[in-house]
Curated annotation (Swiss-Prot):
Belongs to the class-II aminoacyl-tRNA synthetase family. Keywords: Aminoacyl-tRNA synthetase, ATP-binding, Cytoplasm, Ligase, Nucleotide-binding, Protein biosynthesis. It comes from Prosthecochloris aestuarii (strain DSM 271 / SK 413). The lineage of its organism: Bacteria, Pseudomonadati, Chlorobiota, Chlorobiia, Chlorobiales. Homodimer. PROSITE patterns: AA_TRNA_LIGASE_II. The gene is hisS. This is Histidine--tRNA ligase.
Length: 422
């Protein structure tokens, strides 16, 4: 056994587990196509100042969690992406995609990196799927993005979900409320935990989503963000809720819900799953119209999106017994050799079957027929195709259905006609 180990906070995903991931990813791709979203892939690292500018210098992500390095002593600092929205927006602006169409609907399934304390569903290298609707952030657009996210969960059969939703108002509304909240919390400085004290100066809104019961008790008496919203923001939020009602999407209004990234405004939402325990957030998102301006676009760009943690999603699906319903996919045919003398003939058979789009496996380790049959059953092959002296001479092969154990004789052409997909 090697003394090398995976880096702390990372994990290997072997083929038996990858099959479940591929199934979930296929559902995501399918739902994205229902809503006419198109996949985008961006570099795994970006210049550090992109995240400092977009996520916010006062956030925990920028302050504590980014993997940053400087490949050239005289060059710019580079960071492994801790989230996708900033990179997608950078790509959109750099590629001048707005000149092609006013609205772009993009989605991704991508690996991200953060220096977090590893725990179940929270790794230092992790995967998210998400969507960004750029060029529109109307109530209908917000509802469309939420509907797409919930559609994925529905097709996967996930239960025990709670969609929490709130409005953060405009940037100006948030600034007024931030000042009022800080003024309310200052007298409680001696009762706040270290994390909340740090947020009190940098971004007091983050204190609202503290999981510390003592802090939650203090926050329960805080002024409400709703009291600082302009009427237009309230009206817009109610319109979003109306669209969700029309689609039959259940939600809970939560005035304490805030998002951890500074670029959010107006509608914010989060999905919780009861099977994830204390850390029950599955994903979330919201509007971020001001991000394009922050990145130098010169003007706001309407935008709304979400992100869902894939590891957390897989844990929730497993705990609800939904991954066991995914049928294991083995090869269509396992070619079983009676004698190694017929290996050349068997390899040619494999080639013909594969050319006909029939997935085919063959023993390359020189095992006995009994061991080959055990392997065929272990990898859940659908059929065994037997190759021996009689089969080679006649061109007719024994084809055994490994589920029913029935066996018939078939020529290669008949096997291809029966099992071929091409």
């Amino acid at each position: 056994m090697s003394h090398y180990r995976a880096v702390k906070g990372t994990r290997d995903i072997f083929p038996d587990e990858v099959a479940a991931w591929q199934y979930v990813e296929s559902v995501i791709h399918r739902v994205a196509s229902f809503y006419a979203f198109h996949e985008i892939r961006t570099p795994v690292f970006e210049y550090t100042d992109l995240f400092q500018r977009s996520i916010g210098a006062t956030t925990d992500i920028v302050g504590k969690e980014m993997f940053t390095f400087q490949p050239d002593p005289n060059g710019r600092s580079i960071t492994l992406r801790p989230e996708m929205t900033a990179g997608v927006m950078r790509a959109f602006l750099q590629g001048n995609r707005a000149s092609e169409s006013p609205v772009h609907k993009l989605y991704y399934i991508s690996n991200l990196f953060r220096k977090e304390r590893p725990q179940a569903g929270r790794q230092r290298q992790f995967c998210q799927f998400g969507a960004e609707l750029l060029g529109a952030s109307s109530p209908a657009a917000v509802a469309e993005v939420i509907a797409m996210m919930m559609h994925v969960f529905r097709l996967l059969g996930l239960k025990g979900l709670k969609l929490r939703i709130n409005t953060l108002g405009s940037i100006e509304d948030r600034k007024r409320y931030r000042d009022a909240l800080r003024e309310y919390l200052l007298p409680f400085s001696g009762e706040l935990d270290a994390a909340s004290l740090e947020r009190l100066e940098k971004n007091p809104l983050r204190i609202l989503d503290s999981k510390n019961p003592a802090v939650q008790s203090i926050v329960s008496g805080a002024p409400s963000l709703r009291d600082y919203l302009q009427p237009a923001a309230v009206e817009e939020f109610e319109e979003v809720l109306g669209y969700l009602d029309d689609r039959g999407i259940e939600y809970v209004q939560d005035p304490l819900l805030v998002r951890g990234l500074d670029y959010y405004c107006h509608t914010a939402f989060e999905v919780q799953c009861s099977d994830l325990g204390a850390q029950d957030a599955l994903g979330g998102g919201g509007r971020y119209d001001g991000l394009a301006r922050e990145l130098g676009a010169g003007a706001d760009l309407p935008a709304v999106g979400f992100a869902v943690g894939m590891e957390r999603l897989m844990i929730a699906l497993e705990r609800q017994g939904l991954l066991s319903t995914i049928p294991p996919k083995g090869p269509d045919v396992y070619v079983v050799l009676q004698d190694r003398a017929f290996l050349v003939h068997a390899v040619a058979l494999c080639g013909a079957l594969r050319d006909a789009a029939i997935s085919t496996e063959i023993d390359l380790a020189g095992r006995s027929m009994k061991a080959q049959m055990r392997e065929a059953n272990r990898i859940k092959a659908a059929y065994a195709l037997f190759v021996g002296p009689d089969e080679v001479a006649s061109g007719v092969y024994g084809l055994k259905n490994l589920e029913s154990s029935s066996q018939e004789s078939r020529s290669l052409e008949a096997v291809i006609a029966e099992l071929g997909h091409g």
